[in-house]
């Protein structure tokens, strides 16, 4: 039950008026000045705080609902911003939400509820608790609150704001300070079946598509995939009615199937480019990991595209991942109006649809191909009890994304010659230039050169040319357009006056004054729409400057400042935080005093409520040193729990471990154990025994080399018996051995005339253990005969490769 506060009545006596004005906590929504304010007996007494004539703040102040929707969904939360364009500001304000055609003097006139974001900036009015006003009167340029949309059946709602700049300056609650939102039809499911009409618009129009993903654990908590949630890369195109990318009731192509199941846009882009005559622009935007982040952390993805009279439809899709085959997107959105113009803006909330190629019912269902393939259809809340969108009452599915398509320029001759904004004028200045959207993204060009002189030197038709350079072709399968462009022109010999005239655009609006206090300069520009046909130079001015005065009474101690920079990111990831912006001194005060203007500003910022994140964590520390000094190891980093998890368990990791790699460690030679000693090689007398070991690992990366692999030692069994017959046999063997050596030496001596050589030595050890080394052996002169020549009788040396295996 809501208690209505007693209405505050204003007396016309000066004493009570003086008391009422300082105590007022809000602006009035009445159109009368103070002298005409009647006593109010209604639910919210309207307290007038500002005197003077009402003024409309179409350019200075604005009331904006995030996403700029035209419709609201019952029960949905919307961020509302009230702002002033620099150098304007406001000290006080009042914000209310009324049903259409209601005065606000009854409780039931008000629609929805506001939610305070910053209690130091905003508060509910004490005498009108459904309205929001400032907490303290001071200079400000922006405030934000949340508005919770009313229940179904409320109808259209009007958000109204009033502004106080100074206590006796002005207030207003219409124009840019009024926002009308109508209730979204409960039967709306994102499916449209409107006929596609022939387009009668002229020229081309350029649009920007911005995709706002709202799919998060807060909005869709059931079975939300916390670790793999994402939107795939956006893929689509502007096309004619003869080509359909996808549509409800149709079957998914192979390209749509690969987007829906794999998140891959490659095949879809190939299909679109194959329809070259039916497609004007291929629309692409990068994927989003994770699916949702605040806009001050990650900007919403966007893409620009163009449309013309025959290709005035726009379609796109993106996969909701992970999912069986669920997507969101638009199909054949017509950007041409019945009045032969181009749509200014489209805002559409999106719900997921099923591509009909997989029969899974949950985000992470195993692959289950649908055989036979089914038609594309929107998901509903009654599809399956295990579905994350299931509602036994059959309610509508909460939208998972919003797409905003906004016209940013028009080119060429337009049927409707009245421009909607300055961008349209600027974009219409050079109709002879080709649309940049025709150039594939895989072709990187330099800028066009200036037009050359006309090829005709007489009063005759000729051609002029401009060029550009192809810097890179990223995909050789996609052809790149020409690097030269030609245009007809008239030679300079023409005497016709019209041949030397040039057509100019209208002047665009004046720039802001160059200073914030005192006398400064401002400028405006225009552009050459059509150069003289005779190829001569256009001499008409394209820029004008004039003096401007801002605050004539500013003192000599005032200083000139630059414009404010962009706001920093919010210092908090949830709840209340701070953000800052800065500016610099351009010129110090003329009287030599110190500049007292502020060079930095800080204001509070509101992130999603912290209860959606049960624990607040510090940033990750730096990675620790690797656990080893060489080779493969591990390293760690930590973060701390900054606040107690009072609203739930903190399941986030406080430590992370990853592998690290340092230069390889030296590997020493590895050997087997020694074998047993062999038997003595003699049966009597002196002999020897040996033992060996094998190399298991060659040394690597500078490791210790391999030691000996063979050892021998002496052995003596017993003295040999001196049997004469045996002794003679040994003498005979020794004699034959000496004779054999002599014959060998003589045969070797024949190879080197005049020399007797010793046998080759054994090969030396290899100079390297791996990677390729060398070995050497020698043959030395044993005896040189007198008849020998020195050049033919000398020591010999041989070299060979060894250990050629890699390290």
UniProtKB/Swiss-Prot annotation:
Residues 442-495, 501-555, 558-611, 614-666, 668-721, 754-806 form the TSP type-1 domain. One of its GO terms (cellular component) is endoplasmic reticulum lumen. One of its GO terms (biological process) is negative regulation of amyloid-beta formation. SMART domains: TSP1. Disulfide bonds join 44-128, 156-182, 199-336, 200-340, 202-415, 443-480, 454-489, 459-494, 502-538, 513-517, 548-554, 559-595, 570-574, 605-610, 615-650, 626-630, 660-665. Gene3D superfamilies: F-spondin domain, Reeler domain, Thrombospondin type-1 (TSP1) repeat. It comes from the Eukaryota. Keywords: Cell adhesion, Disulfide bond, Extracellular matrix, Glycoprotein, Metal-binding, Repeat, Secreted, Signal. Glycans are attached at residues 214, 448, 451, 507, 510, 564, 620, 623, 674, 681. Transmembrane segments: none annotated. Binds to the central extracellular domain of APP and inhibits beta-secretase cleavage of APP. This is Spondin-1. It comes from Homo sapiens (Human).
């Amino acid at each position: 039950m809501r208690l209505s506060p007693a209405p505050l009545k204003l007396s016309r006596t000066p004493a009570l008026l003086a008391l009422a004005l300082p105590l007022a906590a809000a602006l009035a929504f009445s159109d009368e000045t103070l002298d005409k304010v009647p006593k109010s007996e209604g639910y919210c007494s309207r307290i007038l705080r500002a005197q003077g004539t009402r003024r409309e703040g179409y350019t200075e102040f604005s009331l904006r609902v995030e996403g700029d929707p035209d419709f609201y969904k019952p029960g949905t939360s919307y961020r509302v911003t009230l702002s002033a364009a620099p150098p304007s500001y406001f000290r006080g304000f009042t914000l209310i939400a009324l049903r259409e055609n209601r005065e606000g003097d009854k409780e039931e006139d008000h629609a929805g509820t506001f939610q305070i974001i910053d209690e130091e900036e905003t508060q509910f009015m004490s005498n009108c608790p459904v309205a929001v006003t400032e907490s303290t009167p001071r200079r400000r340029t922006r405030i934000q609150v949340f508005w919770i949309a009313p229940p179904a059946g409320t109808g259209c709602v009007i958000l109204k704001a009033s502004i106080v700049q100074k206590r006796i300056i002005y207030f207003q609650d219409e124009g840019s300070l009024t926002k009308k939102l109508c209730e979204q039809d409960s039967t709306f499911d994102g499916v449209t079946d409107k006929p596609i009409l022939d387009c009668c618009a002229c020229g081309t129009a350029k649009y920007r598509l911005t995709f706002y993903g709202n799919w998060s654990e807060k909005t869709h908590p059931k079975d939300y995939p916390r670790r793999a949630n994402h939107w795939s890369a956006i893929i689509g195109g502007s096309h004619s009615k003869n080509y359909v990318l996808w549509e409800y009731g149709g079957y998914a192509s192979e390209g749509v199937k690969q987007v829906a199941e794999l998140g891959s846009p490659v095949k879809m882009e190939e299909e679109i480019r194959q329809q070259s005559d039916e497609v004007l622009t291929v629309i692409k935007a990068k994927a989003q990991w994770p699916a949702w982040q605040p806009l001050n952390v990650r900007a919403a993805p966007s893409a620009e595209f163009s449309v013309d009279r025959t290709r005035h439809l726009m379609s796109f899709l993106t996969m909701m991942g992970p999912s069986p085959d669920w997507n969101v997107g638009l199909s054949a959105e017509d950007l041409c109006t019945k009045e032969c113009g181009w749509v200014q803006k489209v805002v559409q909330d999106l719900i997921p649809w099923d591509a009909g190629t997989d029969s899974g019912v949950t985000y992470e269902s195993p692959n289950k191909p649908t055989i036979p393939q089914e038609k594309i259809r929107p998901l509903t809340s009654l599809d399956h009890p295990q579905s994350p969108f299931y509602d036994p009452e059959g309610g509508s599915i909460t939208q998972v994304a919003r797409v905003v398509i906004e016209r940013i320029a028009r080119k060429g001759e337009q049927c409707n010659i009245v421009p909607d904004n300055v961008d349209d004028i600027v974009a219409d200045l050079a109709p002879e230039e080709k649309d940049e959207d025709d150039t594939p993204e895989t072709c990187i060009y330099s800028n066009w050169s200036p037009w050359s002189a006309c090829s005709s030197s007489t009063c005759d038709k000729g051609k002029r040319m401009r060029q550009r350079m192809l810097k890179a072709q990223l995909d050789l399968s996609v052809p790149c357009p020409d690097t030269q462009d030609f245009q007809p022109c008239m030679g300079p010999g023409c005497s016709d006056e019209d041949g030397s005239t040039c057509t100019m655009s209208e002047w665009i609006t004046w720039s802001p004054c160059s200073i914030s206090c005192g006398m400064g300069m401002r400028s405006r520009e225009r552009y050459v729409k059509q150069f003289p046909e005779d190829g001569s130079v256009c001499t008409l001015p394209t820029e004008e400057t004039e003096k401007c005065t801002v605050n004539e009474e500013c003192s000599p101690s005032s200083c000139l400042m630059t414009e404010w920079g962009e706001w920093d990111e919010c210092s908090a990831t949830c709840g209340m935080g701070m953000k800052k912006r800065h500016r610099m001194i351009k010129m110090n005060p003329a009287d030599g005093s110190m500049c007292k203007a502020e060079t930095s500003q800080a204001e509070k910022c509101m992130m999603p409520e912290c209860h959606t994140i049960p624990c607040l964590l510090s940033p990750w520390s730096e990675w620790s040193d690797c656990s080893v000094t060489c080779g493969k190891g591990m390293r760690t980093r930590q973060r701390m729990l900054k606040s107690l998890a009072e609203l739930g368990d903190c399941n986030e990791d406080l430590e992370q471990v990853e592998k690290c790699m340092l230069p390889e460690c030296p590997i020493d030679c590895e050997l087997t154990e020694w074998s047993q000693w062999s038997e003595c090689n003699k049966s009597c007398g002196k002999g020897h025994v040996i033992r060996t070991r094998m190399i298991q690992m060659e040394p690597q990366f500078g490791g210790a080399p391999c030691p000996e692999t063979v050892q021998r030692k002496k052995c003596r069994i017993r003295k040999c018996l001196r049997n004469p017959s045996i002794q003679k046999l040994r003498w005979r063997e020794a004699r034959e051995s000496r004779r054999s050596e002599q014959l060998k030496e003589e045969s070797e001596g024949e190879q080197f005339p005049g020399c007797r050589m010793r046998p080759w030595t054994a090969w030396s050890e290899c100079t390297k253990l791996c990677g390729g080394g060398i070995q050497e052996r020698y043959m030395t002169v044993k005896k040189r005969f007198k008849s020998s020549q020195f050049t033919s009788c000398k020591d010999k040396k041989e070299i060979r490769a060894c250990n050629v295996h890699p390290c």
